[in-house]
């Protein structure tokens, strides 16, 4: 539904605005790899924040918040997941949230365009689990687009990120039979039962541990890269005075409607019982 209804509407509205693409500047394969590591670091940091928030919300309301992405990825055919998450989504989302949005807002300042692109990208995911990392990742991809003018760079990075998050991680979770592990733990199994389970799926656990080590490595490396290159992460101001940027870009009717709609979707996703209660009283 997101791609069949919301995206065409968003494209139709945004394309009516005049835009100008950033100047093109090619990057080397080495720079692409460094950018990818930094993207992974942002994704994993954001994912930790999102998980923490949803865990707190779940504890307060007495039930876990559903992870929409993981539910979809683990419950879908892997070929369908690959085509949708790794091929289609990065192309469409980068075209809309980087090409269309940034081209039409960069005149207000590169910082404004980057934050707006990240905010809209984060909200568009429609759930709190993904908002934090999608917001951070969206801003960094917008920064790269502003500096390179190359959409193929951000599409390539987006594809790599989705491949790791929606394909590799899901395959590894299936390889270790996570549901069986949770069942073993919840049944109060002793250490021998846990060891028997892990030996049963030893190849999967080896792959999973390698993946965890990879996450830790890119997380630390990415943070170091951000520290090293922090002085290069500069954005040029735009035509609007500093005090008027928020009102001009965020405080307009279209953006207010967009934010209200997606915040409502996030709340509904976190508290589906509210919808059930309302519809049950109708």
Each predicted region: which residue ranges?
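Membrane-helix interface linkers and caps
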Residues: 1-40, 55-57, 220-243
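Alpha-helical membrane-inserting segments
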Residues: 5, 9-13, 42-57, 144-148, ...
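Juxtamembrane helix-loop-helix connectors linking adjacent transmembrane helices
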Residues: 19-89, 103-106, 270-282
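Transmembrane helix-loop-helix hairpins at the membrane interface
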Residues: 78-270, 274-281
């Amino acid at each position: 539904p997101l791609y069949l209804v919301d995206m065409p509407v968003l494209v139709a509205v945004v394309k009516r605005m005049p835009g100008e693409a950033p100047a093109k500047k090619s990057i080397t394969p080495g720079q692409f790899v460094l950018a990818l590591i930094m993207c992974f670091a942002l994704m994993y940091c954001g994912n930790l924040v999102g998980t923490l928030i949803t865990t707190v919300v779940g504890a307060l309301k007495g039930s876990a918040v559903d992870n929409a992405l993981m539910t979809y990825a683990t419950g879908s055919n892997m070929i369908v997941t690959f085509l949708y998450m790794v091929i289609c989504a990065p192309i469409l989302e980068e075209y809309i949230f980087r090409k269309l949005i940034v081209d039409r807002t960069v005149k207000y300042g590169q910082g404004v365009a980057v934050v707006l692109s990240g905010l809209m990208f984060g909200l568009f995911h429609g759930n709190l689990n993904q908002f934090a990392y999608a917001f951070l990742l969206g801003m960094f991809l917008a920064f790269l687009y502003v500096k390179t003018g190359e959409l193929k760079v951000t599409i390539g990075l987006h594809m790599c990120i989705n491949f790791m998050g929606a394909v590799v991680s899901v395959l590894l979770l299936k390889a270790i039979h996570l549901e069986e592990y949770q069942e073993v733990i919840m049944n109060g199994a002793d250490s021998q039962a846990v060891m028997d389970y892990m030996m049963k799926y030893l190849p999967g656990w080896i792959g999973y541990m390698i993946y965890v080590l990879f996450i830790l490595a890119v997380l630390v490396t990415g943070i170091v890269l951000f520290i090293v290159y922090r002085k290069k992460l500069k954005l040029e101001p735009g035509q609007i005075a500093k005090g008027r940027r928020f009102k001009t870009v965020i405080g307009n009717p279209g953006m207010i409607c967009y934010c209200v709609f997606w915040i409502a979707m996030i709340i509904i996703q976190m508290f589906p019982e509210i919808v059930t209660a309302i519809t049950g009283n109708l």
